[in-house]
Amino acid sequence: IMIKGAIKDKENRYQLWRIWNQEKPLILFILLNPSNADHKNDDKTVKKLIGFTRKFEFGGFYLGNLYSLVATTPSPDRFIKDEDRNIKHIQIMKKKCKKIIVGWGNLGTYPNWLLDNISETMCLGINKNGTPKH
């Protein structure tokens, strides 16, 4: 049985989680922005993350984003930077997870607030411009 959940409001998603084994450690993924996944439904990205997490033999994951605005087509000029509420949620998720994997592609930069709040991140690859692959 998979435990699914999310913390969101009308326009933003702050946390999403999928946990299938509470005895194993969890991963925190930090990507660019949320898409359609919610407390019940998985989108393409969440399905990929489930596969990665199972492959790494973790018991589940939390998903946070650089920007909390839900958008199926990322447009960084619409994102609010340094959102206090989003940062607080990332800090909460960080405490629950053993590993942190970042990945936001060419559209995002490593924001100072993330550098100030999280150390020892991993990624699944590096783009030519130095950003972590999505």
Region spans (language model):
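Active-site and ligand/interface coordination hotspots across diverse enzymes
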Residues: 1-43
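Short, glycine/serine-rich, charged loops/turns that create anion-binding
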Residues: 34-36, 68, 107
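A short mixed-secondary-structure module that forms the rim of ligand-binding clefts
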Residues: 35-57
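Glycine/proline-rich loop-helix segments at beta-alpha junctions forming the active-site rim
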Residues: 76-134
